[in-house]
From Swiss-Prot:
Protein name (database record): Adenylosuccinate synthetase
Active site: D13 (proton acceptor), H41 (proton donor)
InterPro entries: Adenylosuccin_syn_GTP-bd, Adenylosuccin_syn_Lys_AS, Adenylosuccinate_synth_dom1, Adenylosuccinate_synth_dom2, Adenylosuccinate_synth_dom3, Adenylosuccinate_synthetase, P-loop_NTPase
Pfam families: Adenylsucc_synt
Binding-site residues for substrate, renumbered to this chain: V298, N299, T300, G301, R302, K303, R304
Any single biological process term in GO: IMP metabolic process
Organism, as annotated: Corynebacterium aurimucosum (strain ATCC 700975 / DSM 44827 / CIP 107346 / CN-1) (Corynebacterium nigricans)
Nucleotide-binding as UniProt keyword: yes
Cofactor (UniProt): Mg(2+)
Chief location category: cytoplasm
Annotated function: Plays an important role in the de novo pathway of purine nucleotide biosynthesis. Catalyzes the first committed step in the biosynthesis of AMP from IMP.
Gene this chain is encoded by: purA
């Protein structure tokens, strides 16, 4: 059987958790292939609202085995706090499986993340301060600590001491902070060893064997395309590859086994943190989208920057991810606003760009070129089929589909699991 990958098509917070929750009940495994506890999901099940950070949204699907893949960086304290919080509400979160090759976020990663952001001041990237970037940096520098390392105390101690030889020089001499004792870090990791042990698996083997047996695997990407370290608005990006290609790398599932690439995209656009945002609104409509859409970051609590739909970004995301389908979310937020602007191209210093500009400098100077469509006034939160939507809402969806270069198979008309219109069920393609 083949695999499905879910990818955010904008700057995150598109509603990937809802998509995973809906499809997660139809698959055997739900895998988070990248990121850490810096990417939040909000899932509404049975009227209950769940805010997830490190765990995949599939943790709430009883039929699926949730997996943290090798591309994830794991903060063990955050992991077990999240598990305990879910189980206190009746969820069976202890069935989680974790790749032995996933990297761990150490206390010194978090310290360095916060110190470096303060040091940069106005030049700060706007990270969550959770140590994700420094953990990925150590992974690439080959001085990272993996899940498997905490089961061999001598290796763990050696790796921690080697890492702190470098980190303490930075903390003391560059940032005027106290050195971190290696033993404190070792004890921190060892305190979670026994609880972690039954969860650890050779994920690459188990997932590929599951596919060989005809089972379904869903990969739930964190963050989004425009935050990808290679394809996003660098340097205002995350430290991993939350695109379809990154899902293959971060799970150990080969790219030829992925048959459906499902992009999650809002009916408008949002962004958290610093960085260019061509359609950003600074007027009453920005406040309206923020308030009506509930645009507050799950992880940071920061208000999201809001703007109109950007089809240039959508086309770019379609291209770099090879999207086969789109899941459009929050269509209901646009009800009753009169006219809806859609960005169809950019103007950069008097030149029209229908696709992404070549350089980030040009993107920073991009001004949106809009076309407008009439909004609808009818309540759409109870619509179950595309035909039940008002004609103006149908027209808007079809125009986004045309501009984005990919069919829109799912439409979110409210936060609930059942408030989703299915035009095409991607599970039928498997």
């Amino acid at each position: 059987m083949a695999a499905i990958v879910i990818v955010g098509a904008q700057w995150g917070d598109e509603g990937k958790g809802k998509a995973t929750d809906i499809l997660g009940g139809k698959v055997d495994y739900v895998v988070k292939p990248n990121g850490g506890n810096n990417a939040g999901h909000t899932v509404v099940v049975g009227g209950e609202k769940y805010e997830l950070k490190l765990l995949p949204a599939g943790i709430l699907s009883e039929n699926a085995t949730p997996v943290l893949g090798n591309g994830v960086v794991i903060n063990l304290e955050a992991l077990f706090d999240e598990i305990d919080g879910l189980e206190a509400r009746g969820a069976n979160a202890s069935r989680l499986k974790i790749s032995a090759n996933a990297h761990l976020v150490a206390p010194y990663h978090q310290t360095l993340d916060r110190v470096q952001e303060r040091f940069l001041g106005k030049r700060a990237i706007g990270t969550t301060g959770r140590g994700i970037g420094p953990a990925y940096a150590d992974k690439v520098a080959r001085i990272g600590i993996r899940v498997q390392d905490i089961f061999d105390e001598s290796i763990l101690r050696q790796k921690v001491e080697s890492a702190l030889d470098i980190k303490n020089q930075m903390l003391v001499k560059m940032y005027n902070r106290k050195a971190i004792e290696p033993e404190q870090v070792v004890e921190y990791f060892l305190s979670y060893r026994d609880r972690l042990r039954p969860m650890v698996i050779e994920a690459e083997l188990e997932l590929n064997q599951a596919l060989d047996e005809g089972k379904h695997v869903l990969m739930e990407g964190g963050q989004a395309t425009m935050l990808d370290v290679d394809h996003g608005t660098y340097p205002f990006v995350t430290s991993s590859n939350p695109t379809a290609g990154g899902a293959a790398v971060g799970s150990g599932i080969g790219p030829t086994r992925i048959t459906t690439s499902l992009g999650i995209i809002k009916a408008y656009t949002t962004r958290v943190g610093a960085g260019p945002f061509p359609t950003e609104l600074f007027d009453k409509w920005g406040e309206y989208l923020q308030t009506t859409g509930g645009e507050i970051g799950v992880n940071t609590g920061r208000k999201r920057r809001c703007g109109w739909y950007d089809s240039v970004i959508a086309r770019y995301a379609t291209r770099v991810n090879g999207f086969t389908d789109y899941f459009l979310t929050k269509l209901d937020v646009l009800t009753g606003i009169g006219e809806i602007p859609i960005c169809v191209a950019y103007d950069v210093d008097g030149k029209r760009y229908d696709e992404m500009p070549l350089t980030q400098s040009e993107f920073h100077h991009a001004e949106p070129i809009f076309e407008t469509m009439p909004a609808w006034d009818e309540d759409i939160t109870g619509c179950q089929t595309f035909e039940e939507l008002p004609q103006k809402a149908q027209d808007y969806v079809l125009r986004l589909e045309e501009l984005s270069g990919c069919r829109i198979s799912y439409i979110g008309v409210g936060p609930g699991r059942d408030q989703t219109i299915v035009r095409h069920d991607v599970m039928q393609d498997q």
